[in-house]
């Protein structure tokens, strides 16, 4: 099907933007283009690759942690130590409270998002071709961070942590006061303050998830357009420069997601006395 779609750019692009989905009511694979209720479907490809990449990250760090040496470290240990120091430095500079969870959480967010973004550099037809010819699957997308369901799920996880630490440190009363007495500290403006603070609070996970999704979806779309619209002998002249530039985008988006997570949790952890 992939080879056939190359002659029709529109079908080729549509095919590469289709997820491998399962209907939860019948547990059957949904064919691309078929009508279905989005509320009862799961993007299996996004779930699979995000879990595989997360497991890969945890396994590598666990094995290196078990074999860590005090002498001259190996290349992998050195690389992981540099990443750890980089993340730890950012946490110390941005998080004002004391919480042993923030540094491991920030490291996990940074590496996991980076690995999911990195899948965008895999040749666009590689996994779809294997999934179709070997496993007879109708579609396959391999960049989890280009799926809005994944990015919003991660940002909602951060949002629930924001609510948890806000209530834990400031209490329910302090949280309520923060909603109705800021930015104008007068009861007359309570409703107006609540609307402003509620919009500001809810916009955090939405903007966090949409920012990552938008950048990665756009990057994936450019690779698909290059592969679907241009002759094969011209693709390398655009794919290679864009891939090199995209490495910066991949790293930057992982860094931004981590930084905003730290900043939001730092704001939630500040008491009224700070």
UniProtKB/Swiss-Prot annotation:
Its main location: membrane. F-type ATPases have 2 components, CF(1) - the catalytic core - and CF(0) - the membrane proton channel. CF(1) has five subunits: alpha(3), beta(3), gamma(1), delta(1), epsilon(1). CF(0) has three main subunits: a(1), b(2) and c(9-12). The alpha and beta chains form an alternating ring which encloses part of the gamma chain. CF(1) is attached to CF(0) by a central stalk formed by the gamma and epsilon chains, while a peripheral stalk is formed by the delta and b chains. GO terms for cellular component: plasma membrane; proton-transporting ATP synthase complex. Keywords: ATP synthesis, Cell membrane, CF(0), Hydrogen ion transport, Ion transport, Membrane, Transmembrane, Transmembrane helix, Transport. InterPro entries: ATP_syn_F0_a_bact/chloroplast (IPR045082), ATP_synth_F0_asu (IPR000568), ATP_synth_F0_asu_AS (IPR023011), F0_ATP_A_sf (IPR035908). Disulfide bonds: none annotated. It is a multi-pass membrane protein. The keyword Metal-binding does not apply. Key component of the proton channel; it plays a direct role in the translocation of protons across the membrane. This is ATP synthase subunit a. PANTHER family: ATP SYNTHASE SUBUNIT A, CHLOROPLASTIC. GO terms for molecular function: proton-transporting ATP synthase activity, rotational mechanism. It comes from the Bacteria. The chain crosses the membrane at residues 44-64, 110-130, 142-164, 212-232, 243-263. It is found in: Cell membrane. Belongs to the ATPase A chain family. Gene3D superfamilies: ATP synthase, F0 complex, subunit A. One of its GO terms (biological process) is proton motive force-driven plasma membrane ATP synthesis. HAMAP family: ATP_synth_a_bact (MF_01393). NCBIfam families: ATP_synt_6_or_A, PRK05815.1-1. Pfam families: ATP-synt_A.
């Amino acid at each position: 099907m992939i080879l056939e779609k190359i002659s029709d750019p529109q079908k080729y692009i549509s095919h590469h933007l289709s997820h491998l989905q399962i209907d939860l009511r019948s547990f059957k694979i949904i064919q691309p283009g078929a009508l279905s209720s989005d509320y009862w479907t799961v993007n299996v490809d996004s779930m699979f690759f995000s879990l595989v990449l997360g497991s890969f990250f945890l396994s590598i760090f666990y094995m290196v942690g078990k074999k860590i040496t005090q002498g001259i470290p190996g290349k992998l240990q050195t690389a992981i130590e540099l990443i750890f120091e980089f993340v730890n430095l950012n946490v110390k500079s941005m998080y004002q409270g004391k919480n042993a969870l923030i540094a491991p959480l920030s490291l996990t967010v940074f590496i996991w998002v980076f690995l999911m973004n990195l899948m965008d550099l895999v040749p666009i037809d590689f996994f779809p071709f294997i999934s179709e010819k070997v496993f007879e699957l109708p579609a396959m997308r391999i960049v989890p961070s280009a799926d809005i369901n994944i990015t919003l799920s991660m940002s909602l996880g951060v949002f629930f942590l924001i609510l948890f630490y806000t209530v834990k440190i400031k209490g329910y009363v302090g949280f309520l006061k923060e909603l109705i007495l800021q930015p104008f500290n007068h009861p007359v403006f309570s409703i107006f303050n609540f609307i402003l603070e509620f919009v500001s609070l809810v916009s955090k996970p939405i903007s966090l998830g949409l920012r990552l999704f938008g950048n990665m979806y756009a990057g994936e779309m450019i690779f698909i357009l290059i592969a679907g619209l241009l002759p094969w002998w011209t693709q390398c002249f655009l794919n290679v420069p864009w891939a090199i530039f995209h490495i910066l985008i991949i790293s930057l988006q992982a860094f931004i997601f981590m930084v905003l997570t730290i900043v939001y949790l730092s704001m939630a952890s500040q008491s009224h006395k700070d």
